[in-house]
Amino acid sequence: MADAFAGTWKLVDSKNFDDYMKSIGVGFATRQVASMTKPTTIIEINGDTIILKTQSTFKNTEISFKLGVELDKTTADDRKVKSTVTLDGGKLVHVQKWDGQETKLVRELVDGKLILTLTHNNVVCTRTYEKEA
């Protein structure tokens, strides 16, 4: 099922991203740059390993993981998190935990688009990606 997510995805719409970044503690200057950036997300499947690359003029990141296996990761905004990704009802659900906090990043395919919903406390951000040819 995760195979459906494979491909190169370009950000085309973003709602409430600045408020989300503020909620998780991202500083003002970083938020300003990140808000203007339109990243490309590349999802690759290699056996039971998923590789998630995010590329932008701001920063490039890469995470590789197996579903359900908790990893120690450093996020693009330098948070040290415990990170777990699962497949739930056709959605890739990514949970990050740090300092008693938790954020959830849910990726789902809707009408051929990749919808990323980020939630922290009561703040919800939606980012929409279209698949590149």
Swiss-Prot record:
**Binding-site residues, octadecanoate:** 127-129
Give the Phosphoserine positions (modified residues): 23, 83
Phosphothreonine (modified residue): where? 8, 30
Q: Which residues bind hexadecanoate?
A: 127-129
**What are its GO biological-process terms?**
hibernation
Q: Does the keyword Acetylation apply?
A: yes
Q: What induces it?
A: Up-regulated during hibernation in brown adipose tissue and skeletal muscle compared with levels in euthermic bats.
Compartment list: Cytoplasm
Please give the SUPFAM superfamilies that the UniProt record associates with this protein.
Lipocalins
Q: List the GO molecular function terms.
A: lipid binding
Major place of residence: cytoplasm
Annotated positions binding (9Z)-octadecenoate: 127-129
Q: Which GO terms describe its cellular component?
A: cytoplasm
> Which residues carry the post-translational modification Phosphotyrosine, per the record?
20
**Has the keyword Phosphoprotein been applied to this entry?**
yes
Q: Which residues carry this modification: N-acetylalanine?
A: 2
Q: Which UniProt keywords apply?
A: Acetylation, Cytoplasm, Hibernation, Lipid-binding, Phosphoprotein, Transport
Q: What Gene3D superfamilies would the database entry show?
A: 2.40.128.20
Q: Which InterPro entries match?
A: Calycin, Fatty_acid-bd, ILBP, Lipocln_cytosolic_FA-bd_dom
* PROSITE patterns per UniProt: FABP
The record describes the protein's role as:
FABPs are thought to play a role in the intracellular transport of long-chain fatty acids and their acyl-CoA esters. FABPs are important elements related to the hibernating state in mammals.
- Family in the record: Belongs to the calycin superfamily. Fatty-acid binding protein (FABP) family.
**Comment text on domains:** Forms a beta-barrel structure that accommodates the hydrophobic ligand in its interior.
Looking up PANTHER family in the UniProt record yields: FATTY ACID BINDING PROTEIN (PTHR11955)
Query: By what name is this protein known?
Result: Fatty acid-binding protein, heart
> Coding gene?
FABP3
